[in-house]
Amino acid sequence: MATYKEIFGTNIEVLASDPANPVTGQVWYNSTDNVVKGASATTAGAWATATSINTTRGNVATSVQSPVSSVLAYGGSNPGGVVEGETEQYNGTTWTELADLNTARGVSSGGGTNTAALCTGGYLGPPGSTGVVESWNGSSWAEVADLNTARYASGGGVGSNTANLIAGGLSTPPTIVHAQVEQWNGTSWTEVGDLNSSRYASGAAGESYTSAIIAAGGNPGFTGIANVETWNGTSWTEIADVNTARTGLESGGTQTSTIIFGGSVPGTPDPVKTGATEIWNGTSWTEDTDLNTARDGAAPGGGVTATSSAIAIAGTTDAGTLAAVEEWTGAGAPLIQTFTDS
C-alpha cells in the first residue's frame, strides 16, 4: 500500500494544535491530542440556533447583507391581528432596538441594507392592507411614495431602497390575490409585467430588481402552490417547481442560487408548519437540512448565494409566535475530522 508521502510528496505535519484555517484535504498529527486529523468540507447545509430577537412576532420584514451578521428587522404581527412597529438590528451576536416604523404593520416587504432599507405595504390589522412605503436612512424612517396597489404578503423586496421590486400579494377588503408587479426607482412605483400565476406569501430572491425569482406561495384558492417564476426585467417565465408546495415560506440568495425554507403545507383540518429547506442551482430544486423549529412567516435572509448563509428570524409555529432565530451555513463549510483505526 502506498504511503501518505508517496501519494502527496510530503510527510504528515506534526502540530501542537489544529491549524486556524486548514485547507480541504490537509492532514496533520495533533501531538497534544495524540491523534491524526484532517480537513474536509460538509456535504449538506445546517441550521444553528442564534440569539433570539427582542420582540416576539411573526411576519417581519428584513434587509439583509452578506454575511448575515448585518441584518435589519422591522414590523411584524402577532395572533389576533396585533401589528408591530419595532425595528431591530443584528450584528451577528446581539439584537439592538432602533427607531420604530411610523406605521406599525405586519407582512410587509423589505429590501436594501441595514443603513438604507425599504418597508413596502403590509397589513394594518382590521381593516386590512396598506400601500404606505417607508425608507430607512440608518437612524429613522421617512414616508415616501405609496404603492399603486395597497397589499401585503407580496413576494419581493428584491433590490435596494432606491431600486426595488415587489410581486403579487394579498389585499383586503375585498380579498384579492394579486399578480401585479411594481418597480421602485427611488421616487415612484411603476407597474410592470404581471406574474403568470397570482400568488401571495411567496419566497423571493435576486441580485437586483431586474433579476429575480418568485417561488411557491398561496393561490386565489388559499392553498399552497409549488410553481416558480423568474424575472428578466421585462417578463416572467415559469421554471421547475419546488418539491414541497407551501405558503408563508421565506427565502434568500440570487436568481440562480436560491434557498427557501419554512412555510405552511396543506393539512387536515388546518395547514401544518414545515421546516423544509430547498436549494435552487439554476436548474432544479434539491431538499436539504430542515429548520430546527418548523415555522412560517419567519423573516427571510440570504447571503450572496444560497450555499453560503441565510437567517430565519422569529415566525409562527403551530403553538403561536416565537422569537427564535436560526442561521444557515451551506454545504462546503470547513470540517475537521479525527481519524481512528476503527
Please report, for each region that a protein language model flagged, where it lies by residue:
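Polar, enzyme-active/binding microenvironments
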Residues: 1-342
